[in-house]
Amino acid sequence: MLKVAALYQFAPLPDFREVREPLRALCVGLSVKGTILLAGEGINGTVAGMPDAIDALAAELQTGTLFSGRLDNLELKFSQASVMPFARLKVRLKKEIVTLGDPATDPTRAVGIYVEPKDWNGLIAAPDTLLIDTRNAFEVAMGTFEGAVDPQLARFGEFKDFVAQKLDPDRHRRIAMFCTGGIRCEKASSYLLSRGFKEVYHLKGGILKYLEGIPESESCWRGECFVFDDRIALGHGLTESRRAGRLMDGAPGDD
């Protein structure tokens, strides 16, 4: 059984271009495959390999010399795959590790309030909480939280238009957001704060961490969670979906 790691952290990485090749060499040496994005604002990726290899990569990212402790708050979600879900390794340089397209939004400076999965149900059950799914529309169609607003995004960059057209800081006093692994909703929370919203929450570790830790009997999640690899979707306990392969024919990009 292979180990899959979804990882990200917003952190200033002014030398992100210089660490690309050493990071690629490390992954090649560990026979790890997947995609890692590097930008001045941090790191984002999903990789797979033998359990010892993934553990070694995670340890190097968090405490090794390559990043010198700058990724000590790396958000990690682990799951399993019966076969390698990636065809190759890609380490890419980007302007943003998740593309919003607003240069003024800086998650390394300010983000909303993290909510642990165990506290999520209580927050979204409150009548004055507006719950927003920050993923693309095709992902929402496969599964989402009960009562969540679907902004009908074709790509994450359209979130800005949704905010301008549908949200108002004076009317929407408490907003809770979620996404697959936490990165999109974290950046969305930073954007909302920059637009004058005061009480902004986001699910720490995203849907994957929630599905990993919350029993299905207590869950407010309905459906399955799309993932951007050959497994297509995961269910409670991060088990591979048996249904999703019949629903999706290939995986689109992760914008």
From Swiss-Prot:
What this chain does, per the entry, is described as: Catalyzes oxygen-dependent 5-hydroxyuridine (ho5U) modification at position 34 in tRNAs.
Please indicate which superkingdom the organism of origin belongs to: Bacteria
Query: What catalytic activity is recorded?
Result: uridine(34) in tRNA + AH2 + O2 = 5-hydroxyuridine(34) in tRNA + A + H2O
Rhodanese domain sequence ranges:
125-219
What EC number is given for this enzyme? 1.14.-.-
Q: Which family does it belong to?
A: Belongs to the TrhO family.
SS bonds (residue pairs): none
Which key words are in the record?
Answer: Oxidoreductase, tRNA processing
Organism (species): Nitrobacter hamburgensis (strain DSM 10229 / NCIMB 13809 / X14)
EC supergroup of this enzyme: oxidoreductase
* GO process annotations (BP): tRNA modification
Q: Which residues form a coiled coil?
A: none
Catalytic residues at C179 (cysteine persulfide intermediate)
Q: Which GO terms describe its molecular function?
A: oxidoreductase activity, acting on paired donors, with incorporation or reduction of molecular oxygen
User: Which Gene3D superfamilies does this UniProt record tie to the protein?
Assistant: 3.30.70.100, Rhodanese-like domain
Put simply, this protein is called tRNA uridine(34) hydroxylase
